[in-house]
Curated annotation (Swiss-Prot):
GO terms for cellular component: plasma membrane. Keywords: Cell inner membrane, Cell membrane, Cobalamin biosynthesis, Magnesium, Membrane, Transferase, Transmembrane, Transmembrane helix. One of its GO terms (molecular function) is adenosylcobinamide-GDP ribazoletransferase activity. The keyword Ubl conjugation does not apply. It catalyses: alpha-ribazole + adenosylcob(III)inamide-GDP = adenosylcob(III)alamin + GMP + H(+); alpha-ribazole 5'-phosphate + adenosylcob(III)inamide-GDP = adenosylcob(III)alamin 5'-phosphate + GMP + H(+). This is Adenosylcobinamide-GDP ribazoletransferase. The chain crosses the membrane at residues 4-24, 40-60, 64-84, 116-136, 140-160, 193-213. Its main location: membrane. InterPro entries: CobS. One of its GO terms (biological process) is cobalamin biosynthetic process. It comes from Alkalilimnicola ehrlichii (strain ATCC BAA-1101 / DSM 17681 / MLHE-1). It is found in: Cell inner membrane. Its EC number is 2.7.8.26. Joins adenosylcobinamide-GDP and alpha-ribazole to generate adenosylcobalamin (Ado-cobalamin). Also synthesizes adenosylcobalamin 5'-phosphate from adenosylcobinamide-GDP and alpha-ribazole 5'-phosphate.
Amino acid sequence: MTTAVRGLLLALAFLTRLPVWWLGPPRREDHAASLPAYPVVGLILGILLLALYALLQWFFPDQFVVQAALLVAAWALVTGLLHLDGLGDSADAWLGGHGDRLRSLEIMKDPRSGPAAVAVITLALVVKVAALAALLRLDAALAALLIAPVLGRAAAALLIAGTPYARKQGLAGPLAEAPATRWIGLTALGALLFVTALAGWAGLAAVLGVVAVGVWAQHLMMRRLDGFTGDTAGALVEVAELAALLGLLAVLANSAG
């Protein structure tokens, strides 16, 4: 089994709850190879969501809100709620940390969810369902369900590769210690070409939205934590997916009008 394949399997095991056949413990080079595979995991997730969408069209024709709600639910469940959990933990840390680095890191380790987590997760899900429903109504399911997962995970890979790890040890520690390779940049370029080829100007708007929130999120992480954590990387996936959906919608809704 090649290192690239092992890296893809490791990325699938880490980012989803899909049953992944795995042989032996991951090696250091597997962690390095897993980062460029993040957008590929997003593509696999998108294909699964498209298959579900085809089924939902049969049972709930033209019920765009119902379709979007069930798609978002499946989206979250396939990822094991990992990224939503990171979003909630990050929200609690930013509200309860009061600007203190150590306090913020401590809050993120607390398994309990505070009011900020509940509010932010709820808002994120509502916006995601609304944006996806609008895109389904515009017959843009292919673009929405492929582009958002790909760009969300590309953003996380670039964050991890280009940002220090804020903890001495943690779930994302092996990734942070893995050497960044040229393949991450090539993967990001591949994601850009894929998105623009699939959706044109709307895809470019999605990319620009993700780049904007990625730069902003990294700035916040460096200022508060001096780096990223697994939770903040997961939060970025969720926010980047929202940015991608809204970027697509902004262009497609206006062009349809």
